[in-house]
């Protein structure tokens, strides 16, 4: 035993040669995270820009989606690696912050990670890289703000140009001349003059109806429901001078709160039960009719039918139009539009809680029907957009594209500055940051230079997706910007470099600043991860 213990004891306990941490494992995990995130970025890169490709997504339940919206593609993608999931969340963050630039933000993040990978390989510490990226990002925002052109809400043309730029990269780009002005008018109609910088897109309701083409899309000054009027008992389908109630209770016999059974011993008792039910329903309808109400919007009930056949019969006799199964999440929009209050109990049914409209009618549209409420008195600041499409795929993509256009206009309302598109701001950023990197000392300069080079991925990808020579295009862009042409960008339609502002290719400043800020934050977070711990 002593012979065995002797060599063990002779080993130094705190050998300087031994490493305290397993650096190899940390590097492997960091590079695995970077490679996974870059794979996600490469998957959506081909869909960037007006000439970008579309993706066909087939879901597990057999649904097929055709889109080139970055947020939609990534949202439907099954990503398992945790770092790659961060890029999916990054796209969602950009979607909620700006509504557009969801592909751009992921592509920039992928390019930054590629540059960081080479910096790490050269032995630069992740913390140094992270701090330098933060500094470069701040400088980039300052440069973009200096390049921006102020815009006023009265300048409708600038708003339309910006919305058109967003729509030009979509599947429905040929309809941008229709959808862009429609998006601008919809947003401007819901702006509160007292708080002009706040736009709530929940005040704009998009209703999809299959049939026709996207050309038939239009705004409705009032309310539109993709529902039919209940006509089981021959009730009215058109009401003028409507007094509308939005109710959240059922017009049906009451039920007990506890589980119990009632034993009926003879037919007279049965007859009495039916008579009581009839009297109860008649009493409710008399109260409703007494207020002058002639249109009922009934909230959908998950427990039972919101309205029974007997109730429909009596409502039809009272000449009251019934629209049932209104979704719970629509109630707030409906009451705001009609300038009325939702009624939760028959005892609270009052005339002052009703909304007033000139006309409520059921209209035929294609092979289906919709309900329109127009001429609303004291209408709230809301608007409805009726989107049409020849098939479900086009209809869904038209809705997504219109949502992006609405978000772009919202961005301009909240931060009223425009910048050029077509890769012009990214090349200008790359040039100015590259010059700034030369005056920085130490490793910071290398990191900022890498940040500047990463931004060139946007013009490079735009040119590549348009079938142009990306190296020649980016080189020519650099020369133009070096000569002071800060608005020189890629005109993918002409296949050459032009003054992109003159071509009306513009985007909100908020979209670009948000993309660069969020991409930088995400990359810094990925760089700081040196281990993945799985827990049960």
Swiss-Prot record:
GO molecular function ontology, one term from the record: ATP hydrolysis activity
Gene Ontology cellular component terms for the protein in this record: cytosol
Keywords: ATP-binding, Chaperone, Cytoplasm, Nucleotide-binding
Chain residue ranges for the region called Disordered: 1-21
Record localization: Cytoplasm
Record's keyword annotation contains Cytoplasm: yes
InterPro entries for the chain: Chap_CCT_delta, Chaperone_TCP-1, Chaperonin_TCP-1_CS, Cpn60/GroEL/TCP-1, GroEL-like_apical_dom_sf, GROEL-like_equatorial_sf, TCP-1-like_intermed_sf, TCP-1_chaperonin
Pfam families, per database record: Cpn60_TCP1 (PF00118)
Function statement: Molecular chaperone; assists the folding of proteins upon ATP hydrolysis. Known to play a role, in vitro, in the folding of actin and tubulin.
Family: Belongs to the TCP-1 chaperonin family.
Assembly with partners or alone: Heterooligomeric complex of about 850 to 900 kDa that forms two stacked rings, 12 to 16 nm in diameter.
PANTHER family in UniProt: CHAPERONIN (PTHR11353)
Name by which UniProt lists this protein: T-complex protein 1 subunit delta
């Amino acid at each position: 035993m002593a012979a065995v213990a002797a060599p063990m004891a002779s080993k130094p306990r705190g050998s300087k040669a031994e490493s305290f941490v397993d650096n190899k494992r940390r590097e492997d995990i960091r590079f695995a995270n970077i490679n996974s995130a870059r794979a996600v970025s490469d998957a959506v890169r081909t869909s960037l820009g007006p000439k970008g490709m579309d993706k066909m997504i087939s879901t597990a339940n057999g649904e097929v989606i055709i889109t080139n919206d970055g947020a939609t593609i990534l949202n439907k993608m099954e990503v398992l690696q945790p770092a790659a999931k961060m890029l999916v969340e990054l796209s969602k963050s950009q979607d909620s912050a700006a509504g557009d630039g969801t592909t751009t933000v992921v592509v920039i993040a992928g390019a930054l990670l590629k540059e960081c990978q080479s910096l790490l390989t050269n032995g630069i510490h992740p913390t140094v890289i992270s701090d330098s990226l933060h500094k470069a990002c701040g400088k980039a925002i300052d440069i973009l703000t200096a390049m921006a052109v102020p815009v006023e809400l009265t300048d409708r043309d600038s708003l339309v140009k910006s919305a058109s730029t967003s729509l030009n990269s979509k599947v429905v780009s040929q309809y941008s001349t229709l959808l862009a002005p429609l998006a601008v008018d919809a947003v401007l109609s819901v702006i509160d003059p007292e708080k002009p910088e706040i736009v709530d897109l929940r005040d704009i309701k998009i209703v999809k109806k299959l049939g026709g083409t996207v050309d038939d899309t239009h705004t409705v000054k009032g309310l539109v429901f993709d529902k039919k009027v209940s006509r089981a008992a021959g009730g009215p389908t058109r009401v003028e001078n409507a007094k509308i109630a939005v109710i959240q209770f059922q017009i049906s016999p009451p039920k007990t709160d506890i589980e119990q059974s009632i034993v009926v011993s003879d037919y007279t008792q049965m007859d009495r039960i039916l008579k009581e039910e009839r009297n109860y329903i008649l009493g409710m309808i008399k109260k409703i009719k007494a207020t002058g109400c002639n249109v009922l919007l009934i909230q959908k009930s998950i427990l039972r039918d919101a309205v029974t056949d007997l109730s429909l019969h009596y409502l039809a006799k009272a000449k009251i139009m019934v629209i049932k199964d209104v979704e719970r999440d629509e109630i707030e929009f409906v009451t705001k539009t009609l300038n009325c209050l939702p009624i939760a109990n028959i005892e609270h049914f009052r005339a002052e809680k009703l909304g007033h409209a000139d006309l409520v009618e059921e209209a035929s549209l294609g092979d289906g029907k919709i309900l329109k409420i127009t001429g609303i008195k004291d209408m709230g600041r809301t608007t409805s957009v009726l989107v049409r499409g020849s098939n479900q795929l086009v209809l869904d993509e038209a809705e997504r594209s219109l949502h992006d256009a609405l978000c772009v206009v919202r961005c301009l309302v909240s931060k009223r500055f425009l910048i050029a598109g077509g890769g012009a701001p990214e090349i200008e950023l790359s040039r100015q940051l590259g010059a700034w990197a030369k005056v920085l000392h130490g490793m910071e300069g290398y990191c900022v230079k890498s940040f500047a080079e990463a931004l060139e991925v946007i013009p490079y990808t735009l040119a590549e997706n348009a079938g142009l020579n990306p190296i020649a295009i980016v080189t020519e862009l650099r020369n133009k910007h070096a000569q002071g042409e800060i608005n020189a960008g890629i005109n993918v339609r002409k296949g050459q470099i032009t003054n992109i502002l003159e071509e009306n290719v513009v985007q909100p400043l908020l979209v670009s600043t948000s993309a660069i800020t969020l991409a930088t934050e995400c990359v810094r977070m990925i760089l700081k991860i040196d281990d993945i711990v799985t827990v049960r």
